[in-house]
Amino acid sequence: MPPSKWDEEEEEGVSPPPVAARRRFDDEEDGDVLDSWDAADDSEVEREKAAKAAEAKAKAEAEAAANKKSKAQRIAEHKTRRKAAEDEEDDESDEDEAEKRARLRRTEKDSDLKHAEDLFGDIDLNRNRGKNKTIVVHDASGDPTQAVDLSAMPLFKPATKEQFTTLSNTLVPLLTAQSKKPQYALWLPEFAKQLAKELPSGDIKKVASALTTLSNEKMKEERAADKGSKKTKAAKTKVSLVASRSDKIETTAYDDDGLDDDDFM
């Protein structure tokens, strides 16, 4: 007997059973699932940190190994420093007492500067050393537009012998033109001291020797001038005495003076 139409419709209308979703156990909570994910993330971060720390440690060990000096290297460096110190002592023995004092002063000054730098930090105490100071000259009116910056002129920045000669030829006539003034002789010694104070003592001795030589030459010239002046004065006096004698012929007759013989009686 063929199946009825109703049976066929019933069979076609039956659907497969749905797949049951995973159900949470009674003893399982939502927080447990979240904790497991957090733990996984934390472990990954820890592994990355450990890898970076290991890399940094390996790098530091490599640098330390590269910088570490062997015993032979340390001995060689010690010998080099000792030889340099001995060479310096030999050089010091060849210098005279004045040069030694000047060198000691320079060393002491450099030491003081280094100590000051240590005290005051990174201040550059030497930045203005050797640097030309700005020298601005104003006219009598005080007008700033008429000011002249002498330090900017090439004349005042000599470097060669010829340039120093040019500077001397420019300044000497200007200064010596004031030599007849009373204050000139009082001003010049202090001016010379200021010009020479930055020189070593040996160079200052040379300057003093040159001035002594100049003084001796001037004394000879003055003595010679005095002798010549005395001779000229004596000659003028003699000529004056001779010229004062009268060359007039005496014509007075003394036998007829208006007096009789009885006047003497």
Swiss-Prot record:
UniProt-recorded Gene Ontology molecular function terms: translation initiation factor activity
Record-level GO BP terms: formation of cytoplasmic translation initiation complex
Pfam families named among the record's database cross-references: eIF3_subunit
Cited function: Component of the eukaryotic translation initiation factor 3 (eIF-3) complex, which is involved in protein synthesis of a specialized repertoire of mRNAs and, together with other initiation factors, stimulates binding of mRNA and methionyl-tRNAi to the 40S ribosome. The eIF-3 complex specifically targets and initiates translation of a subset of mRNAs involved in cell proliferation.
Keyword hit for Coiled coil: yes
Residue segments, region Disordered: 1-113, 215-237
GO cellular component: eukaryotic 43S preinitiation complex; eukaryotic 48S preinitiation complex; eukaryotic translation initiation factor 3 complex
Gene3D superfamilies named in the record: Eukaryotic translation initiation factor 3 like domains (1.10.246.60)
Subunit record text: Component of the eukaryotic translation initiation factor 3 (eIF-3) complex.
Name of the molecule in the record: Eukaryotic translation initiation factor 3 subunit J
Keyword Protein biosynthesis attached: yes
Main location: cytoplasm
Keyword set, alphabetical order: Coiled coil, Cytoplasm, Initiation factor, Protein biosynthesis
Subcellular location: Cytoplasm
Family statement: Belongs to the eIF-3 subunit J family.
Coiled-coil residue windows: 43-95
Biased composition regions of type Acidic residues, renumbered to the chain: 27-45, 86-97
Compositional bias annotation for Basic and acidic residues: 46-62, 98-113, 217-229
